Each structure stands twice: as structure tokens, then as C-alpha cells.
């Protein structure tokens, strides 16, 4: 994938960049793997706003992704590499030998016509899925399960990857993209390789309207609100915060305040905390 630049024909185009979509092989998704996706605009079942900055955007359909990779021993051929509006990574359509079709996250280097496998007999090749106990130390992986059989939950975004660092009893040490080193059960599955579309982070949206096409609404500063809307609101002119530290709209400390639950049950699985930004 390469980044496409535009001539500054308008102010919105001046710094705008996009993907050239060179890896995409079709624009028509597999109909049997599509599901309707209703827009919620950040509202819950009572119609109350629970997530800010959501609303509008282009109409989408959900692509059913196989995060479990449990078609053991059945070869699958990569039919297409496709764009997915619901995630930063591209997806690959897999045609299995028994006739079933599934979408998976497209790994970097995965090509149309390539054959992939799942299970203990699979080779250590890009796109193959195995249990962590069967993956050699030093291997780069993605789409990692946290509970056996639940499906991949970690390392699914464009360009991300994790590395197998070692094995200790029934656990495997994994270094995640953030730098955190974590113990994960050896019977959990992961897919070999790095997630593709790695230049996604270099894309410059360029103008506010393009954010709106993606369903993102504006973020308003608390300092320009009224005091009944935000702890930073009110005052005459450009007033200071008036508190010891910045606050969230709900009165909780923010910008550096630790929100992780103390004595979290999963603390025992974290060997080293993530890198500080």
C-alpha cells in the first residue's frame, strides 16, 4: 500500500492524503457474509446519549469476520483482498475446500491464490493460525485470543503485531504492540504475521467533512461550555479551569489520571507494563 497525495486545489485538499488501495482486488463484498448495521448515533436503548462524537456518516454493512480461525485441517484459498469500512485493516475472503467462505483479517504479504491452514499441523507461514504453544519463540503474530476458543481480541488494527518471547508452563509470554509483556494461555490461538495496511496511520484526513463521512462529530472544548455542561465551563472571557487538575465532563480527573481498576484480576498476567508515551 502507498500513500496518495493530492494537489492543493482547495484548502481541504492541501494536506489531504489517502490510501491508493493497490492491494484491494475487488469492490464487491461476499453477500452471504454481510449483515445490516444500524446507526445508533451514540444513543442507548433509552435514546440517551452515552457516547459523544458519534453520528452521521456513510451507510455501512457489517462484514462477518472469522476471529476464531477454527477450520482445522481444511485448506483455504485467498480469493480476494477487500476494503472494510468498519476497521482500519483490510480483510481477505477465504474459500475453503469444503465450500465454506469466511473473511479474515488480511496479514501483510497475504496474496490472492495463497493457501492458508489452521490447527496444529499448519506451517509457520503468513496467514496460518495455530495455538501459541505450537508457535516458535521470536515469531511475529496477530489476532491473539485471550480465552481459548473465544476468538482473537488482541492485535487486530492495521499495521500492528506482537511477538512470542518465551514459554513458561501453560503460559506463553507475548510482547504486545504497546510494549506490554503479557502471559497468555498456551492453548489460545494466534495468526502468523503482521496485520496489513500498515501505512494507515500516515493518512491525513485533510478536512472536517471527511471526518463527518466516517461518522465522527466535532469535539467541543469544555472551557467554551456553560458550567452546567462541563466542569471547565463558565467564567468571564477566557477563564482558567479553576480546579486542581483538568476534569472530564462527568467531574472525574483526566489527562494522566489512572483509570485502571486497582487489584484487577488480570494484573497477575501482566509481566511488564506498556511503554510510557
UniProtKB/Swiss-Prot annotation:
Keywords: Ribonucleoprotein, Ribosomal protein, RNA-binding, rRNA-binding. The keyword Cytoplasm does not apply. SMART domains: Ribosomal_L2, Ribosomal_L2_C. GO terms for biological process: cytoplasmic translation. Pfam families: Ribosomal_L2, Ribosomal_L2_C. GO terms for molecular function: rRNA binding; structural constituent of ribosome; transferase activity. GO terms for cellular component: large ribosomal subunit. InterPro entries: NA-bd_OB-fold, Rib_uL2_dom2, Ribosomal_uL2, Ribosomal_uL2_bac/org-type, Ribosomal_uL2_C, Ribosomal_uL2_CS, Ribosomal_uL2_dom3, Ribosomal_uL2_RNA-bd_dom. Residues 24-55, 221-277 are annotated as: Disordered. The keyword Oxidoreductase does not apply. It comes from the Bacteria. Part of the 50S ribosomal subunit. Forms a bridge to the 30S subunit in the 70S ribosome. One of the primary rRNA binding proteins. Required for association of the 30S and 50S subunits to form the 70S ribosome, for tRNA binding and peptide bond formation. It has been suggested to have peptidyltransferase activity; this is somewhat controversial. Makes several contacts with the 16S rRNA in the 70S ribosome. Belongs to the universal ribosomal protein uL2 family. This is Large ribosomal subunit protein uL2. The lineage of its organism: Bacteria, Bacillati, Bacillota, Bacilli, Bacillales.
Amino acid at each position: 500500500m502507498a500513500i496518495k497525495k493530492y494537489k492543493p486545489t482547495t484548502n481541504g485538499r492541501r494536506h489531504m492524503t489517502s490510501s491508493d488501495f493497490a492491494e484491494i482486488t475487488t469492490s464487491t463484498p461476499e453477500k452471504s457474509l454481510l449483515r445490516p448495521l444500524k446507526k445508533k448515533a451514540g444513543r442507548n436503548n433509552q435514546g440517551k446519549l452515552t457516547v459523544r462524537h458519534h453520528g452521521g456518516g456513510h451507510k455501512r454493512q457489517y462484514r462477518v469476520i472469522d476471529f476464531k480461525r477454527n477450520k482445522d485441517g481444511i485448506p483455504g484459498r485467498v480469493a480476494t483482498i477487500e476494503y472494510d469500512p468498519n476497521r482500519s485493516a483490510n480483510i481477505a475472503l477465504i474459500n475453503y475446500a469444503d465450500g465454506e467462505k469466511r473473511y479474515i483479517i488480511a496479514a501483510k504479504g497475504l496474496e490472492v491464490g495463497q493457501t492458508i491452514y489452521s490447527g496444529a499441523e499448519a506451517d509457520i507461514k503468513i496467514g496460518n493460525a495455530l495455538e501459541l504453544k505450537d508457535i516458535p519463540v521470536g515469531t511475529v503474530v496477530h489476532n491473539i485470543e485471550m480465552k481459548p476458543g473465544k476468538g482473537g481480541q488482541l492485535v487486530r488494527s492495521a499495521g500492528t503485531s506482537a511477538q512470542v518471547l518465551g514459554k513458561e508452563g501453560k503460559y506463553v509470554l507475548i510482547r504486545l504492540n504497546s510494549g506490554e509483556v503479557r502471559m497468555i494461555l498456551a492453548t489460545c490461538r494466534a495468526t502468523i504475521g503482521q496485520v496489513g495496511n500498515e501505512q494507515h496511520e500516515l493518512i491525513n484526513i485533510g478536512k472536517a467533512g471527511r471526518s463527518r463521512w466516517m461518522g465522527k462529530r466535532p469535539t467541543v472544548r469544555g472551557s467554551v461550555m456553560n458550567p452546567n455542561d462541563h466542569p471547565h465551563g463558565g467564567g468571564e472571557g477566557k477563564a482558567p479551569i479553576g480546579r486542581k487538575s483538568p476534569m472530564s465532563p462527568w467531574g472525574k480527573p483526566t489527562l494522566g489520571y489512572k483509570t485502571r481498576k486497582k487489584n484487577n484480576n488480570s494484573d497477575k498476567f501482566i509481566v511488564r507494563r506498556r511503554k510510557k508515551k
